[in-house]
């Protein structure tokens, strides 16, 4: 088993960055992004078995459904790459069996290595209250799973931290694993980079959970130059249905594909349906400028020119930006 520290370094290497992204996308169930992350990881040199081990380990932190969905996605990715003639490296063989007399003791000692602290039997508090969960943690997670040396302890903690950082409401466990990660050689600089990757793949809010724990400045959720705009549009009646179809497609693509588009919410007046109102919210001015150059917006713009009778753009200022993150949260 490979539990040794690695030499401290300032940055995550490309393979480590891929492990972060794969773990994050798995944890939140974003299979579309996961497919991209898996391809990128293989291209960066992660072996098939390294990725299998990471996805298998993640069931302990984000559940069997997320883990199984990710593994099925990985199988699809490998099949597609094979059909294109891409030969990926299997890597070190995965050892499935773990034949030891006392798995609890094996897991307890592994946990002592990771935490650098004595681990009593049963674990105080939780282990006494729910002995079976204590047994599962020691005998399965820290014995059966961690016994495989396909991933180092440091890589395993990078996987775990990335997953927990992507899930809301698990700050206590994230704190514990960040401490363990540091024991395996993960540095604050690498955790800062990990947080930046989580911000890209999940949100600023989740990335800030890591930054807060390691004492780094939090990134503001709402940018000072956030743009809020109301578009007042009157449509030529004969084009109304065609316009609504194009607008619906453009709004959906913008929200799904552009991280800087917080909302594009089209509406029309009930008594006068040719009067369209669109609430547009952009993270910042750069996001708005980027939006204007996207293919879906350009298609919308050129396709609807003849349909628009009048257009009035009204830039707004929010009275309370701190409540912006609560918009639409109740619609689930």
Regions found by a protein language model. Give the residues of each.
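N-terminal targeting signals for Sec/Tat export/insertion, comprising classic cleavable signal peptides
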Residues: 10-32, 233-245
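Short, structured motif recognition centered on aromatic/hydrophobic residues
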Residues: 17-25, 51-55, 155-165, 194-198, ...
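Short, solvent-exposed alpha-helical surface patches in well-structured domains
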Residues: 19, 53, 158, 193, ...
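Short S/T/G/P-rich N-terminal loop/turn motif that feeds into the first structured element of a domain
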Residues: 221-276, 281-293, 298, 309-332
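Non-heme di-metal
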Residues: 173-174
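Acidic, glycine/proline-rich low-complexity segments that act as flexible tails and inter-domain linkers
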Residues: 4-16, 27-43, 49-50, 64-153, ...
């Amino acid at each position: 088993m490979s539990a040794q520290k690695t030499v401290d370094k300032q940055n995550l290497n490309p393979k480590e960055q891929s492990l972060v992204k794969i773990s994050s996308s798995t944890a939140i169930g974003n299979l579309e992004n996961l497919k991209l992350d898996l391809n990128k990881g293989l291209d960066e040199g992660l072996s098939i078995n390294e990725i299998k081990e990471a996805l298998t380990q993640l069931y302990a932190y984000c559940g069997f459904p997320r883990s199984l969905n990710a593994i099925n996605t990985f199988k699809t990715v490998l099949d597609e790459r094979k059909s294109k003639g891409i030969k990926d490296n299997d890597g070190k063989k995965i050892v499935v069996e773990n034949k030891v007399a006392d798995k609890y003791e094996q897991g307890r000692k592994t946990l002592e290595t990771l935490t650098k602290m004595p681990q009593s039997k049963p674990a105080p508090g939780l282990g006494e209250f729910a002995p079976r969960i204590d047994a599962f943690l020691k005998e399965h997670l820290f014995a059966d799973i961690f016994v495989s040396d396909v991933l180092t302890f440091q890589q395993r903690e990078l996987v775990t931290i990335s997953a927990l950082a992507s899930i809301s409401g698990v700050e206590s466990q994230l704190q514990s694993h960040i401490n363990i990660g540091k024991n395996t050689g993960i540095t604050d600089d690498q955790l800062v980079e990990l947080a930046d990757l989580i911000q890209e793949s999940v949100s600023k809010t989740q990335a800030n959970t890591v930054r807060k724990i390691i004492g780094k400045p939090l990134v503001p959720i709402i940018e000072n130059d956030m743009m809020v705009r109301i578009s007042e549009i009157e449509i030529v009646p004969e084009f109304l249905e065609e316009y609504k179809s194009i607008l619906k497609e453009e709004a959906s693509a913008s929200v799904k594909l552009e991280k800087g588009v917080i909302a594009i919410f089209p509406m029309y007046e009930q008594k006068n349906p040719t009067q369209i109102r669109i609430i547009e919210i952009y993270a910042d001015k750069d996001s708005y400028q980027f939006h204007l150059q996207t293919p879906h917006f350009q298609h919308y713009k050129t396709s609807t020119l003849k349909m628009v009778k009048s257009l009035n753009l009204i830039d707004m200022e929010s009275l309370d930006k701190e409540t912006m993150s609560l918009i639409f949260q109740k619609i689930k």
